[in-house]
Amino acid sequence: MAKIGVEPSLTDVQEALKERGYDVVPLRGEQDARGCDCCVITGLDANIAGIHNIVTSGPVIEASGLTAEEICQKVEEKLR
């Protein structure tokens, strides 16, 4: 299953993705994003640790204003 990086403050999203079988890793910095198929960030820092620019070639989803369910749907859409 895909490896999804999620900011630590998004615990509900982490749990929802784990329930769907994804390998979830907390994004604390640039190193954590390496090898992720997709990253979910809060949007407070839209370029957390350079993730948009360098580290991951996968999609980056901004979680602000979305429910955990909506984020899971976006992850699934992006990984198709």
Curated annotation (Swiss-Prot):
<dbReference type="InterPro" id="IPR005370">
    <property type="entry name" value="UPF0180"/>
</dbReference>
<protein>
    <recommendedName>
        <fullName>UPF0180 protein GK1051</fullName>
    </recommendedName>
</protein>
<dbReference type="Pfam" id="PF03698">
    <property type="entry name" value="UPF0180"/>
</dbReference>
<comment type="similarity">
    <text>Belongs to the UPF0180 family.</text>
</comment>
